[in-house]
Amino acid sequence: MSNVTVAMSGGVDSSLAAYSLLKQGYSVSGITMIFRILFPDGESFLIGEQSAEDARKICAQLGIQHQIVDYTESFNEFVIGDFTNNYLEGRTPNPCIICNKNVKFGVLADHAFQNGSDYFATGHYSSIVNINEKYFIKRNPLDPKDQTYFLYKIRKEILPKIIFPLSGMQKSDVRLEAERANLITASKKDSQDICFLPDGDYRNFISKYISNTDICVSSGNFVDNEGKILGKHNGIFNYTIGQRRGLGVAYSHPLYVSGFNIEKNEVILSKKDELFSESLSASYVNLFADLDSGEYQLKTRYAQKDKSCIVKMTDNKLLIDFIEPIDAVTKGQSAVLYRGDLLIGGGIIDEVFY
């Protein structure tokens, strides 16, 4: 009998994942991570306490062991540091991607394997497929909130040991199955996108994080593409590419954030049509297969529809040419590649070419 550790969030997805594995005859245990956000001034707050309690209860209902692990050090090192530094440097990061790579499918999965688990499972709706002895993550075309964009940085070496018990399902299916199984989490609401932003406001978080430090965030100028001053901004980290609301600049036509000049502490504003770019480069690349000369499907942000592109690899960077221009491509976000529904890999966008 194979041992499987399920990453338990206390939600319906991971609950049904554990239940399904039990029904398939696996020896199942649950694990939940908690962590503290550590602010430079010494203040901290705990994340995951309620999730851990909910996970403990569902594991008790299922009759399986449950373990809580504290990954404060790892989460602050890999996720919070990257998150704040990117925003302060005019980039827009995606912390869930970094967390999946380094924490959930990093130290958490490794902990499971080191303690005797043969497999590590989560409540994703994607699937793991083996094609010619190469393992891929395959997106679920029925899932309107497909999560594979956030999974492209997982180490390919551990894919053979990952199980997604809910592959091919939809949320409505999951809730129905959970109700049939009388799982106590069947009607629990879905979790928020970014776990350490309870109010969803990253600006407040960064302002608090850098308070009482020697990091100085000063106001500067909004400028157009020619450098003409259009108004004052209140700190570069408050803005992202494509942003229109909250600029406080009156002009003859709508203006959007199109770039940053970090050295001059300037936020560049442009017309909508000037947000469209032709290509990008991406670093910190992770690929599940070698690239070829054919077309790939591309996402430059999570909710985006697929865009066609041509890709080549040069000096450990992805150089991606768009078949048609794409708007609001943003440094710090990820360029994620697909071939059909197969996740091929991706990288962090570091340059955008117009």
PLM regions with names:
Residues M1-Y152, D173:
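ATP-dependent adenylation/nucleotidyltransferase module used to activate substrates
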Residues A121-Y354:
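AMP-forming adenylation/ATP pyrophosphatase catalytic core
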